[in-house]
Amino acid sequence: MLNTKVIECIPLNLYLSAKFLVLLQVTSHNEFIKTNREDIRLYLKREDLIHPYISGNKYRKLKYNIKEALTQNCESLLTFGGAYSNHIAAVAYAGSINGLKTIGVIRGDELAAEIPNNPTLTFAQQHGMQFKFLSRSSYRNKMSNTFIEELNNQFNNFYLIPEGGTNALAVKGCEEILTDNDSQFDFICCSVGTGGTLSGLINASKSHQRI
């Protein structure tokens, strides 16, 4: 008898989130994908169906960060990204539904005049995000102590979320992607950007599973 291998694929760039979902435990279902291999069962974890505007892993990454921002009584969320960053759009929407102002530090100062032609920045602006555009050379130094101090002087009481949303709280949120129902899978596959989703999956996986 063939040893059946079960593979779960988790998409990275999708959309999700809803008002105060930060307080909820959200799960997604596994959709069977038919293949031409009888010894393989392939499933797609539908994190994209959690919400239309905050993508699956974006919701997971933001959940505990927003909770922490509210706990610290911060007035706004500040983060970084490019012209077509799903993270920028997700932060803008999540902030708006949680009563937090949002600030996006955007790579490319030429984009300041192109907001109407950019669907991502237009969406973020429509949900209240304020932009600070940087030249591409200046953007490379965005996490320097000098620049962070400049941001503090300009925007005051903000909660800083790294580019792509990955930090310890983001990893904690991504650990919730896998549930007890997913323990049947032998392999768990996902695409990788900043590594936050992958780290959460590794932490939450069972000893028999390979990531």
Which role does the model predict for each range below?
Residues M1-I211:
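PLP-dependent amino-acid enzyme catalytic core
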